[in-house]
């Protein structure tokens, strides 16, 4: 026993930890399990969530929405002697408001008897499932709004604009897994982003797993750069991060890949709906979309009274966030059309 005598204490009694802290016998007995569970949930969330960090992020404090400001290009003119410089009274400025969706939860009830009879760690498995569920919802929202960003005109239209909007690259019908078509799309995307003066740092491509492996298995290594791994075994296994034309390549099952029409869901305060029948990938820079987050991924469990009444623990993972397009110029959608 980690704490001598703990196994003989009753509910409501206390024990003194080696640190000198006095806690309830129940808290001391189960503290390690809950910490392990929380850690497993965060680990699973972070490993499954690939969109995190590839777009702009804001944490909300005492607010329900975040404001983002766009600025357009300005002109330069020659000064005429004797005339005042008054400046532009209508600078090219626009705003984008991104609100938070309703609270997103993933939960499970862990019955004590099930945990006792199982020959594996139920808490560990459940923690991973909760983490994956939150990460999947997070990624799906972001990838949809990036696709919508690629189809959106820039909000600043004033002179000397309009500013460039999003772009769609069509691979051709049935070419979603064609390696050469994908390579051509990468170089076309790099050219488009350069022509729009989009920063080269933070450029990312997201493909389906089948596209990803078709690409890295068929493309010449002179075109495909690897961040690490120098053997053919690394290439065949898909280990490492790969780049084409300075664009980092990732794979995900959370793209709206040839998904058809995706409707709105109750609780979503941003619009993630759209027709994704021809969608087959994304290439974007981090300014293409933004995420606002009010509550980061957290874990909650019921207390001792509930455990006694129901002979188990209700375990809840929660996340409060919202996402929407930000700068359309930084978003490119690949379509099999």
Locations of regions flagged by a protein language model:
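Structured, hydrophobic secondary-structure cores that serve as assembly/anchoring elements
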Residues: 57, 65-67, 72-73, 86-87, ...
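Short, polar/proline-rich extracytoplasmic segments that appear immediately after membrane translocation
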Residues: 89-90, 147
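Alpha-helical scaffold segments that mediate packing/assembly in large oligomeric complexes
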Residues: 115-195, 333-337
């Amino acid at each position: 026993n980690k704490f001598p005598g703990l196994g003989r204490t009753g509910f409501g009694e206390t024990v003194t930890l080696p640190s000198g802290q006095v806690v309830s016998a129940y808290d001391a007995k189960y503290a390690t399990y809950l910490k392990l569970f929380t850690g497993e949930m965060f680990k699973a969330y972070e490993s499954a969530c690939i969109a995190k960090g590839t777009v702009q992020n804001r944490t909300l404090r005492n607010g329900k929405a975040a404001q983002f400001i766009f600025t357009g290009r300005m002109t330069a003119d020659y000064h005429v002697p004797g005339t005042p410089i008054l400046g532009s009274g209508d600078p090219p400025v626009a705003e984008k408001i991104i609100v938070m969706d309703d609270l997103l939860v993933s939960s499970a009830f862990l019955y004590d008897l099930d945990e006792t009879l199982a020959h594996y760690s139920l808490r560990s498995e459940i923690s991973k499932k909760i983490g994956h569920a939150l990460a999947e919802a997070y990624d799906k929202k972001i990838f949809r709004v990036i696709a919508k960003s690629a189809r959106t005109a820039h909000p600043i239209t004033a002179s000397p604009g309009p500013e460039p909007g999003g772009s769609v690259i069509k691979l051709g019908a049935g070419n979603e897994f064609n390696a050469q078509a994908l390579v051509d799309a990468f170089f076309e995307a790099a050219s488009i982003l350069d022509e729009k003066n989009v920063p080269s740092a933070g450029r990312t491509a997201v493909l389906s797993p089948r596209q990803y492996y078709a690409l890295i298995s068929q493309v010449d290594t002179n075109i495909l750069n690897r961040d690490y791994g120098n053997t053919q075994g690394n290439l065949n296994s898909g280990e490492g991060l790969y780049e084409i034309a300075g664009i980092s390549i990732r794979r995900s099952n959370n793209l709206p890949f040839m998904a058809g029409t995706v409707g709105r869901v109750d609780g979503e305060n941003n619009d993630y709906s759209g027709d994704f029948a021809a969608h087959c990938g994304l290439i974007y820079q981090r300014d293409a979309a933004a995420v606002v987050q009010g509550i980061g991924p957290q874990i909650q469990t019921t207390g001792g009274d509930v455990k006694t009444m129901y002979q188990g623990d209700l375990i809840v993972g929660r996340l409060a966030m919202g996402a929407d397009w930000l700068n359309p110029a930084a978003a490119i959608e690949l379509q099999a059309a």
